[in-house]
Swiss-Prot record:
Membrane topology field: Multi-pass membrane protein
Organism: Schizosaccharomyces pombe (strain 972 / ATCC 24843) (Fission yeast)
Predominant location category: membrane
Gene Ontology terms: cellular component: membrane
Transmembrane segments: 50-70, 80-100, 127-147
Location in or out of the cell: Membrane
Keywords: Membrane, Transmembrane, Transmembrane helix
Protein name per its UniProtKB record: Putative uncharacterized transmembrane protein C1235.17
Length: 150
């Protein structure tokens, strides 16, 4: 129990630290890089670039979290002498999850773009879109953590 408990705590802590730093970076980048044209209106193209950067960063963070999880699990497997079959199943599980995340990212990016085309004419509405994305992100990150705990 001790080793398994430590293994879970390491994964959760690593995921939390990486995600927290990512959110700070994304928010800073969003507010600093919110481009404006000469008339003082927000430039939609620069906004979409920022959204794209946020989505890309989120993908890399998830990939990094998976790598951290894989490394800690590898050490866990070596210390507990878990069979090759179990290890192979775990690798396949990670590959499937990364494949699914890719399609989830594309789907929600298309939703954001479609949503922004109608609503991104003011900064207040942009805040709503970004807030929606981060709420979605943390909600599914929480579900992902709960699923891993089972």
């Amino acid at each position: 129990m001790g080793r398994c408990g430590t293994h879970t705590q390491i994964n959760f802590l690593a995921g939390f630290v990486v995600r927290f730093n990512n959110v700070k970076t994304c928010l800073a980048q969003f507010w600093v890089n919110m481009g404006q044209n000469k008339e003082g209106n927000a430039d939609k193209s620069s906004y979409f670039k920022v959204v794209s950067v946020i989505l890309t960063l989120r993908g890399y963070v998830q990939l990094g979290y998976m790598v951290i999880h894989l490394v800690t699990h590898t050490l866990h497997c070596i210390t507990l002498y878990i069979t090759i079959t179990h290890y192979t199943i775990y690798i396949v599980n990670i590959v499937i999850q990364l494949w699914l995340y890719r399609y989830i990212e594309r789907f929600f990016y298309s939703l954001l773009v479609e949503y922004c085309e109608n609503l991104c004419d003011s900064k207040e509405k942009r805040k709503v879109v970004i807030r929606f994305y981060f709420h979605f992100y943390f909600f599914f990150s929480f579900l992902f953590f709960i699923e891993k705990k089972k």
